[in-house]
């Protein structure tokens, strides 16, 4: 199957990007300065991420659509304000996660941002669940870029006046070169920032303006280290069809009203796990010393019994040390619990810790993922 390219592919090439294949797309993993420098630049300035491989699903409908979506997602969509966004999940009957997503309420319906590897399957699942009653468009004519970091608001505001007025997890339509684009104040780096949905034919020009104003292109490598420092889940690592939001320590993302009344797909198992406790739970892990524990590293208790597994691990440039997330048996999930990590046949000491590893907020409400 032919590898797809985003509308910014030539710009990536011109900026000497190193590419990898991801979810069927040729995507920039890093540029010439390298992942660590790109990571640090985003934390101190403003980084531009091409995330056009992700799905932008527009579903058009009225109050009936809202009612039908509440049977699917564990959200209080009836009371979601216009242009407000929520983090949520598409789940199976056992509350395993098909995908984690961001859903935004628009005047004519909803915009749902889906993970690249999941978007086609998500579309099929939602089409079946909604029984084709509503117009659904998985829009490949629009690109998606994320502008992240403390200087992003000032840079973007030079191009889109009043974008600084947006609250965290809210959005609005703006006009650029005579065309409409949709901007939300959101992101997945632990920094203040924005995501911009813009037509494919304008995205390169728009991105060049951001670059001229001081932002830099950042690859997916730094996006991963940034999200891990922020303690954020990555689908296929911390989330999947065998893992529930409760096990992933994401109870906060389920509306309280829905927890009380249920009525959404997977609600029976969600409510049961809250009542009885999940057997395994996602935790932060801080290895002692400089050892990096990668995905699938086995986790042991001090008696050297296996109690879990690492799902993501890296060197955290902002904390200047190794960090990891993983799942452990509930009884070993308390902060400061001492554990062992098996790397290349040897066991090394580490500690369970809280999340995020790195905490910084520039806009009210931005630390929505803190555990």
Describe each PLM feature range.
Residues 50, 100, 195:
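Acidic active-site catalytic centers that drive phospho-/nucleotidyl reactions
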Residues 1-90, 96, 220-221:
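Acidic, proline/glycine-enriched N-terminal capping motif
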Residues 93, 98, 113-117:
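Short coil/turn segments at secondary-structure boundaries
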Residues 53-60, 89-91, 108-110, 141-147:
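Conserved short loop/turn motifs at secondary-structure junctions
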Residues 98-101, 352:
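Short beta-strand and beta-hairpin "edge-sheet" elements
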